[in-house]
Curated annotation (Swiss-Prot):
Cofactor note text: Binds 1 zinc ion.
Biological-process GO terms, alphabetical: negative regulation of DNA-templated transcription
ATP-cone domain ranges (all copies): 49-139
Protein name (record): Transcriptional repressor NrdR
Keyword Transcription: yes
InterPro entries xrefs: ATP-cone_dom, NrdR-like_N, RNR_NrdR-like
NCBIfam families, per the entry: transcriptional regulator NrdR
Record function comment: Negatively regulates transcription of bacterial ribonucleotide reductase nrd genes and operons by binding to NrdR-boxes.
CC cofactor: Zn(2+)
Keywords: ATP-binding, DNA-binding, Metal-binding, Nucleotide-binding, Repressor, Transcription, Transcription regulation, Zinc, Zinc-finger
Species this protein is from: Psychrobacter cryohalolentis (strain ATCC BAA-1226 / DSM 17306 / VKM B-2378 / K5)
GO molecular function, one term: ATP binding
Pfam family, one: Zn_ribbon_NrdR
Chain's gene name: nrdR
Zinc finger boundaries on the chain: unnamed: 3-34
Amino acid sequence: MHCPYCNASETKVIDSRLAAEGAQVRRRRSCNSCQERFTTFEVVEVVMPRIIKSSGKIEPYDNDKLRRSILLPLQKRPITIDEQEGMISRIEKRVRQMGEREVSSKVLGEIIMSELKTLDDVAYVRFASVYRDFQDIDAFHQEIANIRPNEK
């Protein structure tokens, strides 16, 4: 690791600790040349599978696109940023755990819907209406009935 102050290549680790709930390693370093101290963070590089669109086109996974598609139905809902970020992390984890190099957008959409369903019914129906291309009010009624099958 090069020193950010003098660009020397010889540095030593003074302290290492887990950070971000174990997702990162925080290291305090000292430069052997100028004795300045600095902090680095080490994270695992995660490779997400490519997404196969319904048209057959293959695109790289896009975290921003996932985030936008989830945040839109969650607008004006009582969901905290931490809950939103947690859901995005769970979705990405489920996709990675599939162990595939390519995943269809249909599978990704179903994972998103299952996560939204457990988080917020209204956001789930909003997302489902676009994802499943609801054409009339009956489609909404049917989806709501599926959420609450025992209620009349």
